[in-house]
UniProtKB/Swiss-Prot annotation:
E.C. number(s) listed in UniProt: 3.4.23.36
Annotated membrane topology: Multi-pass membrane protein
Classification via HAMAP family: LspA (MF_00161)
Organism lineage string: Bacteria, Bacillati, Actinomycetota, Actinomycetes, Mycobacteriales
Subcellular localization: Cell membrane
Gene name per UniProt: lspA
Name of the protein in its database record: Lipoprotein signal peptidase
Chief site of localization: membrane
Length: 198
């Protein structure tokens, strides 16, 4: 009789189901995996858009802008001028192309690792911008002259006194600024607030 009462007790069945679910999760509470997958997808979609836009605009710039002959768009402030940059974003650190290539590879690996536990859409946006920009300039580093890991990046946007840049540079800088802001306000990649219990 006792066995029959236990088998008919819905509470006991619910507890058993909960234990079965927790067996797969050492923490005892399974994380909402669909949210993580969605944020990771958002990260890669943003990175893909930045990468595709960067590559397309560079192809158009090389095909249509003659070196040394800028195309003026807004007065004498904004223009398109073709520059092949051996340095980092905004023509910084010229002469260190191979080192910048290694740094960019490290950035890509770091972003992908963080993306494994990503749950914040804002972090997905920031990391996606950085990842897309890093990949865009890496393509130039590996496949443009003068050689692998020493290729010069194509820059073509000139605004006033600011160094000539490209779409990838803009993605890296905007993404980095967003990540700094998120860090300052205490928002973690997993969506939690620093100092607030999960």
């Amino acid at each position: 009789m006792d066995d029959e009462r236990v088998s008919q007790d819905p509470t006991a069945e619910n507890e058993t189901d909960a234990e079965d679910r927790n067996d797969d999760d050492p923490s005892g509470s399974a994380p909402p995996q669909p949210v993580t997958h969605q944020r990771r997808l958002l990260l890669f979609v943003i990175a893909g858009v930045v990468l595709a836009t960067d590559l397309l605009t560079k192809i158009l710039a090389v095909a249509n802008i003659e070196p040394g002959r800028p195309v003026w768009l807004i007065g004498d402030i904004v223009s398109l001028r073709l520059v092949r940059n051996p340095g980092a974003a905004f023509s910084m650190a010229t002469g260190m192309t191979w080192l910048l290539t290694l740094v960019a590879v490290g950035v890509v690996i770091g972003v992908v690792r963080i993306g494994r536990t990503l749950r914040s859409p804002w972090w997905a946006l920031g990391l996606g911008l950085v990842l897309g920009g890093a990949l865009g300039n890496l393509v130039d580093r590996f496949f443009r002259a003068p050689g692998v890991m020493q290729g010069h990046v194509v820059d073509f946007v000139s605004v006033g006194w600011w160094p000539v840049f490209n779409v990838a540079d803009s993605g890296i800088v905007c993404g980095a600024i967003l990540l700094v802001v998120l860090t300052l306000i205490g928002l973690e990649p997993d969506g939690t607030r620093k100092g607030v219990e999960k």
